């Protein structure tokens, strides 16, 4: 047993020398590349106890290689985590590319969206959400997705969906309604896109209220986008809508979106590009 322990100590304290390595004036092994020690002396007491006076150490180039390898592994793990979050978090895969980096910078509310990401810890702690409201095509969904993507890059789990998808999932789900809603509300941030566009049936409104109320009770922030006006949200048409809108407006700070319809502008740009391509083809014939 004693011999086995001694052999183990010898293996642990042994240093493997490369061809270019050399012994320095202090008696330690030095790296032939970076000329820093590959060994360190034990304290006198430890050396007497172990029967060995030195142990291996990283030279500068070994340390640099290890740090580079660990950084690459960490980066790869981060990329895999973010990819998994985006795959799970978006019901529309196209939204994975809706980022601040791809933004044209023309939306006046871009800084408001960036502020939410930069202040995420406070937004989460104080349960502050956004209600993006305004006309069609003004960039509400895009900036909401920008927030989602930016937080996912920080490895924060976000779910961005809409009530059309939620109602379909509830109808087709093999798990119970409560379990589905609980899973939806477990995300640190929930984003409901195109709020108010869902079916106005009694069943649909009841499910909408259930999700909104469950999110409210979870104490976690919610972001919603809607084409409804603030007037419509503050003065609903009936009691079922009043219950829903009251919960929503108590959770989310309203942010108005005005200005150009970016979708119409994009469609016009594509039309002009098509005309240009057709003209070029005609001229080449």
Named regions from a protein language model:
Residues 61, 105, 163, 257-259:
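Active-site donor-binding loop signature of nucleotide-sugar glycosyltransferases
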Residues 88-130:
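Pre-Walker A (pre-P-loop) alpha-helix and adjacent loop at the N terminus of AAA/AAA+ ATPase modules
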